[in-house]
């Protein structure tokens, strides 16, 4: 009933659906009680009654429905939070509906082909943000490098504003390590500016690295980096593995302090080779010399 007291909403809804040739009405279970009213209107007009499919609600948890009023995300919110449209569509399609088999990742065209209302569950579905993160990471990994670089660049540039650092090269380090796009800025901020860090980062048990060994490595790698002709992955790697061999240590004992000095972080996308290549020779050497000063 509208505010003017007339039953125009239900009337218009039935007329509209009939004129559009609607055969199936799919809606939330909260509308189940209104079905008899619609049926009376269809019968009054002498029209065929469509088939009704009433879907169970999507829940925040076992007791509460999702609600924008209570801070649950809308589609627009999820996109703004770094989720891909295709990943959201895929995940939402599986809320309250189950395809046959174990496959979970589907393109929209695949979903259109396999969808059948018989797979709709009578039980409410619970929205699991961690599951959506998993779906999103799978979609990110499946993208072509060029497509990922295109969607990642705006997020890279939030923290890496220096245009001399190639966004596509940085994106290549991120693609297999990113779940949502909004994680990107804090992962790569060290490219734009070397963060403050303590010498304790040079201590790493697995790499058998400590402050003294790190100082020795940096003192020896700097002239080797200075002597490289073509600043590329192959030559940067060769300088480090060659030093490790000459010192009689494993590669990790050389690469750990180089990466810490170059990035100022213990956890980075990419290793010492890729980071040094993107930074360039001059900036890499500058950062390695800063590390030497820290190490005394």
Regions found by a protein language model. Name each.
Residues 145-247:
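Small-residue-rich helix-loop
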Residues 20, 96-101, 141-143, 182, ...:
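Short helix-capping/linker segments at secondary-structure and domain boundaries
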Residues 234-295:
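Charged substrate- and nucleic-acid-binding regions of tRNA-handling and nucleotidyl-transfer enzymes
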């Amino acid at each position: 009933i509208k505010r003017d007291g007339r039953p125009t909403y239900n009337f218009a809804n039935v007329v509209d659906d009939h004129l559009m040739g609607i055969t199936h009405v799919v809606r939330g279970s909260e509308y189940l009680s209104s079905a008899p009213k619609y049926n009376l209107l269809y019968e009054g007009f002498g029209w065929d009654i469509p088939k009704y499919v009433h879907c169970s609600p999507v829940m925040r948890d076992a007791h509460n429905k999702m609600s924008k009023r209570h801070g649950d995300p809308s589609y627009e919110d999820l996109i703004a939070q770094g989720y891909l449209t295709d990943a959201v569509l895929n995940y939402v399609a599986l809320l309250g509906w189950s395809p046959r088999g174990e496959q979970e990742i589907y393109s929209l065209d695949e979903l259109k082909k396999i969808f059948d209302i018989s797979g709709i569950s009578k039980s409410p579905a619970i929205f699991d943000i961690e599951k959506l993160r998993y779906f999103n990471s799978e979609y990110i990994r499946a993208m072509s490098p060029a497509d990922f670089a295109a969607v990642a660049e705006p997020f890279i540039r939030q923290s890496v504003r220096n245009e001399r650092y190639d966004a596509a090269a940085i994106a290549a380090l991120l693609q297999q390590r990113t779940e949502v796009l909004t994680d990107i800025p804090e992962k790569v901020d060290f490219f734009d500016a070397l963060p403050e860090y303590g010498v304790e980062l040079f201590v790493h048990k697995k790499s058998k690295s400590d402050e003294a060994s790190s100082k020795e490595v940096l003192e020896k790698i700097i002239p080797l980096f200075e002597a490289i002709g073509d600043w590329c992955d192959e030559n940067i790697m060769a300088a480090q593995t060659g030093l490790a061999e000459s010192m009689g240590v494993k590669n990790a004992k050389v690469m750990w302090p180089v990466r810490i000095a170059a990035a100022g972080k213990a956890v980075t996308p990419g290793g010492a080779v890729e980071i040094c290549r993107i930074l360039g020779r001059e900036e890499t050497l500058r950062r390695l010399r800063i590390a030497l000063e820290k190490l005394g």
